Amino acid sequence: MLRKISLFMLFTIVWSYQKFQMLIPNGDAVPNPCAGQSGIWGGVGHNVAAGGGLNNQFGLDFNSSGKVWTPEFCQKDSDQDGKSNGFELGDADCKWTPGGTPEGIATGHPGVCEPMNSSKCQQVNKNITCSPSNYT
């Protein structure tokens, strides 16, 4: 019984992130910005790559936009690194719509200030967790 509950919870979590990933351009291909790590940051709106727990500023802004990719949300710089959310997600012109193909690839993480080792970004990223166990 415990195994069934665990599998159900895992499926629910994975499905939830996939659902949200489809609502932003390249949501399933956001690069992991942590030094020495590679792969995809699956929980784009969260402080840990695997998702869950607290939202990062991008996740908070996503919720504030009604979970809709709007021109305003696209043009916003949620992580304060000088690059708009759209630019980092491959939609610099903010023309992407769900189900469409973004004009480019995701070049950064819209919820993690980069470069992470800069003094500005270290302060902005104080709640971001870079731990290998958190990556997908």
Task: Please tell me what each predicted stretch does.
Residues L2-Q80, G86-T136:
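Calcium-binding acidic motifs and repeat modules
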